[in-house]
């Protein structure tokens, strides 16, 4: 079962992560986001409601 031999797969994995962290990550992080996030503190007003089967009615007692 050759897939249990970690020698070739570990080398591929480690070289891929090495390339990603050293070469690609600074290039990706150098781009500026087009839409900067704003610090809006808008509270979302949600109206709560009850489920029909949780309402207590006097006809079912």
UniProtKB/Swiss-Prot annotation:
The chain crosses the membrane at residues 10-32. The keyword Membrane applies. Keywords: ATP synthesis, CF(0), Hydrogen ion transport, Ion transport, Membrane, Mitochondrion, Transmembrane, Transmembrane helix, Transport. Pfam families: ATP-synt_8 (PF00895). It is a single-pass membrane protein. Its main location: mitochondrion. InterPro entries: ATP8_metazoa, ATPase_protein_8. It is found in: Mitochondrion membrane. GO terms for molecular function: proton transmembrane transporter activity. One of its GO terms (biological process) is proton motive force-driven ATP synthesis. GO terms for cellular component: mitochondrial membrane; proton-transporting ATP synthase complex. Component of the ATP synthase complex composed at least of ATP5F1A/subunit alpha, ATP5F1B/subunit beta, ATP5MC1/subunit c (homooctomer), MT-ATP6/subunit a, MT-ATP8/subunit 8, ATP5ME/subunit e, ATP5MF/subunit f, ATP5MG/subunit g, ATP5MK/subunit k, ATP5MJ/subunit j, ATP5F1C/subunit gamma, ATP5F1D/subunit delta, ATP5F1E/subunit epsilon, ATP5PF/subunit F6, ATP5PB/subunit b, ATP5PD/subunit d, ATP5PO/subunit OSCP. Belongs to the ATPase protein 8 family. Subunit 8, of the mitochondrial membrane ATP synthase complex (F(1)F(0) ATP synthase or Complex V) that produces ATP from ADP in the presence of a proton gradient across the membrane which is generated by electron transport complexes of the respiratory chain. ATP synthase complex consist of a soluble F(1) head domain - the catalytic core - and a membrane F(1) domain - the membrane proton channel. These two domains are linked by a central stalk rotating inside the F(1) region and a stationary peripheral stalk. This is ATP synthase F(0) complex subunit 8. It comes from Chelonia mydas.
